[in-house]
């Protein structure tokens, strides 16, 4: 029996037309602006099988970068055309997809997967209809953002807003019945913090769902990837990697080795 493989999804965050990446090893280390296409192709050439492409401005309600995201997706597709003997690199689009307009915008990019934010839970009738429409497709994932509350336990939230939704167990039960096939799970207290990948939340989700799960946020070290890989037999599929890669805590090649991808 082969050892489990943890899928790695390096993140490319887009803001004001640029790929933005943190610099320095602290939370206040500043930001570097890069060409978005070059940023994405760096990971493709390093061996990534997925790119997690995020419109930060749409996520935080300060505009969109649709044209830039379209250029990145097209560049990855073009790079795939030159690659032989290996599976094509796929693109997961994320950031602010919470209603019909934003979903249509995301789908217009022709991505391989769209991550619908947990804020969509606020409009359950729309979300239920969308999940039913794509029930036989692997096109949609549900971004499950949560924060621990001392009185309620894990509670769903939407980053960039004051919205607080149902408790985790209630949300999972409803989403399962609505037809969710994959979750992108984030402990929002860990995201961007280099404080660990939120294993407690992941354990809770994996214990309550048979859907595929991708972890996001907080990874700081190769040891974190070892921990996440140990969860693969229990339903964890992959992890979105961001700050730890960009500030140099480890290389993508090292991450692939630990994840079992090479």
Where are these regions (language model features)?
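Short catalytic helix/loop segments, enriched in acidic residues and glycine
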Residues: 25-45
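Alpha-helix-loop-beta-strand connector modules within alpha/beta enzyme cores
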Residues: 10, 62-92, 128-145, 196-222
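Conserved, mostly hydrophobic/aromatic
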Residues: 13, 43, 51, 106, ...
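Conserved anion-binding
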Residues: 15-27, 107-191
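Catalytic cores of alpha/beta
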Residues: 90-114, 200-235, 250, 254-255
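C-terminal helical cap(s) of enzyme catalytic domains, especially alpha/beta-barrels
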Residues: 125-134, 229-232, 236-241, 245-262
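Glycine-rich, proline-tolerant flexible connector loops at the mouths of alpha/beta enzymes
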Residues: 50-68, 118, 185-194
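Structural preference for beta-strand elements that scaffold enzyme active sites
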Residues: 7-11, 50, 88-92, 112-115, ...
């Amino acid at each position: 029996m082969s050892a489990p493989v943890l899928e790695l999804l390096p993140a490319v965050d887009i803001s004001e037309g640029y790929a933005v990446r943190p610099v320095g090893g602290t939370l206040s280390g500043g930001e570097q602006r890069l060409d978005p296409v070059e940023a994405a192709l760096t990971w493709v050439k390093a061996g990534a099988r997925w790119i997690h492409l995020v419109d930060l401005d749409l996520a935080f309600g300060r505009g969109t970068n649709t044209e830039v995201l379209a250029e990145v997706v097209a560049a990855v597709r073009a790079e795939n055309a030159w690659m032989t003997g290996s599976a094509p690199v796929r693109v997961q689009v994320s950031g602010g997809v919470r209603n019909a307009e934003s979903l249509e915008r995301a789908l217009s990019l022709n991505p391989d997967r769209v991550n619908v934010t947990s804020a969509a839970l606020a409009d359950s009738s729309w979300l239920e209809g969308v999940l039913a429409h794509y029930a036989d497709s692997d096109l949609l994932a549900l971004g499950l953002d949560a924060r621990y509350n001392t009185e309620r336990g894990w509670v769903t939230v939407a980053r960039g807003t004051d919205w607080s939704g149902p408790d985790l167990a209630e949300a999972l039960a409803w989403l399962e019945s609505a037809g969710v096939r994959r979750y992108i799970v984030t402990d929002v207290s860990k995201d961007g913090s280099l404080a660990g990948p939120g294993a407690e939340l992941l354990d809770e989700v994996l214990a309550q769902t048979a859907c595929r799960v991708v972890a996001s946020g907080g990874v700081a070290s190769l040891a974190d990837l070892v921990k996440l890989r140990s969860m693969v037999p229990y339903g964890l599929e992959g992890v979105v990697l961001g700050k730890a890669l960009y500030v140099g805590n480890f290389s993508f090649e090292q991450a692939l080795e630990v994840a079992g991808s090479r």
